[in-house]
């Protein structure tokens, strides 16, 4: 969607010619489900307006979305020099706890950052307030808010022990990385106000 993006690369054993395609979100979820317990090769065939994935005893065929994919590279932040580093599990659990105060997971989690401290807060007039403080590595002062569901979704995808979030300013997208994974990055837009 226009508020978040993930980019993952993986290396192929051999170079192949394959025109870029756009897959429906439902197809991606179905493919991920098939791949969860699978560790073999996947044969991918581009059939004009359809794509076919063959793995073991399963075949998934899907229509493709017409059109050309937007230039996502221009959306990746390039000047985010303010680096936050924190334990992944602590971060994920804290965001989840603070967000649980709100009835609506779309409510913003406010980050109040100072030197080596991240204060997380949610304020919902109907269900109350939630606050937590984490010790982090950070060298700046910054106040910024994010949709809690987006943060939880991204953090849940990471496998390492740490999460790194790179900021520019309050209104610019954040770049999120797992320092142990050089092939994936995540971009999340902050909430306004």
Predicted regions, residues:
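Specificity-determining recognition surfaces
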Residues: 71-72
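Short hinge/gating elements
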Residues: 75-78
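DNA polymerase processivity clamps
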Residues: 1-7, 14-65, 80-193
């Amino acid at each position: 969607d226009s508020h978040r993006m993930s980019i993952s690369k993986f290396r192929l054993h051999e170079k192949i010619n394959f025109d870029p395609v756009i897959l429906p979100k439902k197809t991606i979820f179905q493919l991920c489900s098939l791949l969860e317990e699978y560790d073999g090769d996947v044969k991918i065939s581009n059939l004009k307006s359809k794509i076919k994935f063959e793995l073991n005893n399963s075949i998934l065929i899907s229509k493709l979305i017409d059109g050309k994919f937007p230039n996502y590279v221009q959306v990746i932040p390039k000047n985010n020099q303010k680096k936050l580093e924190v334990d992944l599990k602590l971060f994920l659990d804290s965001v989840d706890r603070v967000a649980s105060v709100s009835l609506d997971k779309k409510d913003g989690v406010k980050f109040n950052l100072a030197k080596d401290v991240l204060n997380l807060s949610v304020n919902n007039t109907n269900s109350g307030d939630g606050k937590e403080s984490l010790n982090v590595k950070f060298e700046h002062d910054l106040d910024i808010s994010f949709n809690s569901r987006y943060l939880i979704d991204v953090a849940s995808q990471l496998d390492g022990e740490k999460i790194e979030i790179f900021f520019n300013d309050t209104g610019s997208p954040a770049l999120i990385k797992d320092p142990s994974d050089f092939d994936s990055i995540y971009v999340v837009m902050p909430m306004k106000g």
